[in-house]
């Protein structure tokens, strides 16, 4: 890939979030153009930053896609970066996109995170990253802006779990 065509957020390449969103919108627009009307597109995406998730959402929405379903791809072994980086995410959301407008809930992002925490039956210390992935998926499916970066969500999850104990 030519550096100019690479879709990344990079200070050294002078590519900020709006540039990233614009380039992603172009990709999703081309996907929509070639995809049959009754077909779906699956996207695997990974980020620990809410602003990047919201750029992705705007990109596929602006291109005419909506989220039909989400799930999380839980890999059995995390990458080195996922293990050593504070605020890293584990469990890449799989996003099933369809042509057309999606739903937009009036729920608040924090209410979604609270619901995911409440419905989680696992050891939170081990699974805060999976809770975050589920939170992202639920926000995408309901058309709600992602408000929590991974690190902020992990701190919030820890506080909520202390209250429960």
Could you describe each region identified by the protein language model?
Residues 1-165:
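S-adenosyl-L-methionine-dependent nucleic acid methyltransferase catalytic domains
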């Amino acid at each position: 890939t030519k550096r100019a065509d690479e879709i990344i957020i990079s200070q050294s390449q002078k590519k900020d979030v709006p540039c990233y969103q614009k380039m992603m919108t172009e990709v999703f627009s081309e996907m929509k153009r070639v995809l049959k009307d009754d077909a779906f597109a699956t996207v695997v995406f990974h980020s620990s930053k809410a602003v990047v998730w919201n750029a992705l959402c705007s990109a596929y929405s602006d291109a005419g896609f909506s989220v039909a379903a989400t799930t999380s791809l839980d890999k059995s072994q995390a990458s080195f970066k996922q293990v050593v980086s504070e605020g890293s995410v584990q469990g890449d959301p799989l996003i099933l996109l369809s042509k057309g407008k999606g739903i937009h809930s009036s729920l608040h992002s924090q209410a979604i995170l609270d619901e995911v925490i409440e419905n989680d039956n696992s050891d939170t210390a081990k699974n805060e990253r999976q809770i975050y992935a589920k939170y992202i998926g639920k926000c995408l499916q309901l058309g709600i802006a992602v408000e929590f970066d991974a690190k902020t969500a992990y701190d919030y999850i820890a506080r909520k779990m202390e209250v429960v104990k």
